[in-house]
Amino acid sequence: MSMFIRKEIDLGSGKTLSIETGKMAKQADGSAIVRLNDTMVLATVVSSKTPPSPNQSFFPLQVEYREKYSAAGKFPGGFFKREGRPSEKEILSARLIDRALRPLFPDGYYQDTQIIISVISSDQINDADVLGGVAASAAIMVSDIPFQNSMSEVRVGRVNGEYIVNPNINELRDSDIDISIGGTENTICMLEGEMDEISEAEMLEAIRFGHEAIKKICALQNEIAAEVGKTARTFSAAKAPDNLRQSIAEICSNELKELAYMPLCKEERAEKTAEIYKNAKAQTLQRYQQEITPEVIAAEPEKALYLNEQIIGDAIHSIEKQVMREMILDDAKRLDGRRLDEVRPISIELGLIPRAHGSALFTRGETQALVTLTLGTKKDAQMIDTLTDDADKRFMLHYNFPPFSVGETGRVGGTSRREIGHGNLAERAIRKVAPAESAFPYTIRIVSDILESNGSSSMASVCGGALAAMDGGVPLRKPVSGIAMGLIKEGDRYAVLSDILGNEDHLGDMDFKVAGTADGITACQMDIKIDGLDYHILEQALEQALHGRLHILDKMNEAIQEPRTEIGKYAPKLTTIQIPVDAIGMVIGKGGETIRSITEETGAEINIEDDGTVTIASASGEGASAALETIKLLISKPEVGTVYSGKVRDIREDLGAFVEFLPKTDGLVHISEISNERVAKVSDHLKPGDKVKVKLVDVRKDPRTGKTRFALSIKALAEKSADNGASDKAEANR
């Protein structure tokens, strides 16, 4: 029978975080509820007890984070009125939790494991994502699932120089830091966030501050786990016996070492590595197949490992990893021959996509991003509806990673979680220097298509995104660049790597992406695979990243120093004016008739805000100007001598035609003012619904009714046209 336990901790600033277990979801292997004010998160974990396949070599961990609309007393949108597939926010939150938890499961634990985090209550000011990380860790800690250490996640903000743990959305609006930190009592294992160009020292200070809160929450989890008192289940990690690994090393370690010291391109290295793997497997199997017969395996089942191709492949991989790490630590030499702090060669080309509003091809080594800019109007903004925010998103960056970029075939279709995560990081990096809506009222969409990848494609998207925006005339406050840092650590020896390759990411201990301007950091993301990362290593990584960023910015400045003064040739031209609030109805017209008419005549798109801000968009400057003039006329007072576009409302055969020349304002075109020729019947010249240009020739008040009467003329315009024609003819005859 489950035991109910509830404990809480004071986070400061009047915030109390509580963890409870033993009340809900008791059939899961572990469950926990974390609460901060009225935001509550339920996390459950279930890990299969069926042994994994002997050939399995990965940990099938699935983390799902879902925000229930009922948690905030809301109805989901759509016809079915129920939650559907995960939103982008839910996917990003799930990744945040997954990345912090995954390194803490023991090596060789390959049981199918599923963690489901559900937001069951939301006060709509406290985001639940980092609470989900705490709840997930607590659920594992009270289960029998093997887990190395409790993990906690916090968000750190800074308002007026004061650091805050788990700032609410109101505090975040005034904060210059928004960073999520995941860690254990001993170390930091995950970072992700955005900042207003803060220094490396300030970044470290924020991490230290957050880690202190993490230690307290981890201690709380440990207390609860001790009271529950479950013993971790045992498991058998299938790995190569020592003498098998030694035999494999004798076969392939020298070849792998020789290959490591060859500065080859990615494709050549992959081909030669595959050949070494193939030969080493064949020689190993040949060596043991005669010795280990079915009878031997029946007597000693563990001997089957000597003939397991997956186990042999894993052993070769571990030798390859060891060779690369020793080369870096012993000789300060990398797979492609670079120094530890050296950035790969960079090339940049701008404006190569003729119809895009801005474009850049950014190539760094064997990583290449084709980035395009599209500018749109307010109606192109993305509508965001989450538990804590309802807003229009007017800056977005989308990242695409097709399989051909790594020389593979694969599924092409929906956006993967990885693509969403990488795009979000690049978006946050550039958004910090994007212009305010008041200065640049466009919706901005940047798309990064990765054409080649050998590490650090998200940071290539940052650089390419900033370049494409500047090429398209987006007035970024400053250019932004990004770099991915790596780490190799063995005991007290370590090496920090700048601009890591795919292999260095895969075989190394850290992936630390840092983006920013010349003046400070705007975004970061870090994943650590080891326990015990020292702060002095983080400090060195940040300092080395700064030098790398500045080097990349210099290369970007060679291509373009300032945003172009004009937007792209094919981008919509926007004009903004302010009209009185009481004139909004006049511009829109009955049932939208007036605004539709302007759109049809000018080809411009018109958007009107409740405060009277009118934004006019058109593919041509002429269309925007025509729409602007029409709107100005609509809201202006009638002036004698002004020409208006009107619509015939009614005709009187013996009197003339009544024309609506301004919304709800009619004037009379007397029968004598229709044409220079004699008009016998008005209907011979005009019909109700006809659109005509008229000139206001007189305004007077009716002495009997007191109403203002407007006298209009079509003839006056014809006379003016004739006069201009005669003048032109006379000029030509001179």
UniProtKB/Swiss-Prot annotation:
Positions of transmembrane segments: none
EC top class, as a word: transferase
EC number: 2.7.7.8
Cofactors (names): Mg(2+)
Keywords: Cytoplasm, Magnesium, Metal-binding, Nucleotidyltransferase, RNA-binding, Transferase
GO biological process terms on file: mRNA catabolic process; RNA processing
GO cellular component: cytosol
GO MF annotation terms: 3'-5'-RNA exonuclease activity; magnesium ion binding; polyribonucleotide nucleotidyltransferase activity; RNA binding
Reactions mediated catalytically: RNA(n+1) + phosphate = RNA(n) + a ribonucleoside 5'-diphosphate
Signal sequence range: none
Domain S1 motif: 641-715
Domain KH: start-end pairs: 572-631
Sequence positions that bind Mg(2+): 505, 511
Compartments, record wording: Cytoplasm
Source organism, top-level taxon: Bacteria
Protein function: Involved in mRNA degradation. Catalyzes the phosphorolysis of single-stranded polyribonucleotides processively in the 3'- to 5'-direction.
Recorded family membership: Belongs to the polyribonucleotide nucleotidyltransferase family.
NCBIfam families: polynuc_phos, PRK11824.1
Annotated protein name in UniProt: Polyribonucleotide nucleotidyltransferase
